[in-house]
Swiss-Prot record:
SUPFAM superfamilies recorded: HAD-like
Metal-binding in keyword set: yes
Gene Ontology biological process terms, A to Z: carbohydrate metabolic process; DNA repair; glycolate biosynthetic process
Organism field: Pasteurella multocida (strain Pm70)
Active site (UniProt): D10 (nucleophile)
Transmembrane segments: none
Family per record: Belongs to the HAD-like hydrolase superfamily. CbbY/CbbZ/Gph/YieH family.
Keywords: Carbohydrate metabolism, Hydrolase, Magnesium, Metal-binding
EC number(s) recorded for this UniProt protein: 3.1.3.18
The keyword Magnesium appears for this protein: yes
Protein name according to UniProt: Phosphoglycolate phosphatase
Amino acid sequence: MTQFKLIGFDLDGTLVNSLPDLALSVNSAFAEFDLPQAPEDLVLTWIGNGADILIARALAWAKAQTGKTLNDEQIKALKRRFGFYYGENLCNLSVLYPNVKSTLETLKQKGYLLAVVTNKPTKHVQPVLQAFGIDHLFSELLGGQSLPAIKPHPAPLYYLCGKFGLYPKQVLFVGDSKNDILAAHTAGCAVVGLTYGYNYNIPIAESKPDWVFDDFAQILTILE
């Protein structure tokens, strides 16, 4: 065993490729308000800071495309419709990234505590993990509404340290975006940056994680 006792993971872009379902849900909601349909590769650049900011970025794009704006009530209604569609399509097109399930199972068998720390709406976290048969592997699930602050704030990692009686150096975090790297480093935790996720089309290495991996299974190499 290494110095690490707990390993925390981001969800979207780290464990699960949820982009197809997120794009479907944005576009379904947009269609109801006569807004343009966004391609997946564009929706990818809006992911990572929670649903409210995703919608804000989407609306800014739609305004630039069409000049159309929504009033506050319409924006609230749009967010509700996005939430409805995403609730209906949590795992319709989404898939686990390669080697995620087997690696998580190996880590659990080795005695590591596992946790999810995501900015995704809290109510969606457990259902997504359950759909892929991995929810039972985690000792804690933190979503966008679990705590007063979300990544890149370090609060979720401080919370994990407090709950499990750990020092930051005993926590390893794994993510795919600059928000993950910043949260971990601010908290004093080591962090893995994965190259395949959603980082606004910016190489994750530019955020200076402690390790950069192309394959989820490579996490095991630093825990031997």
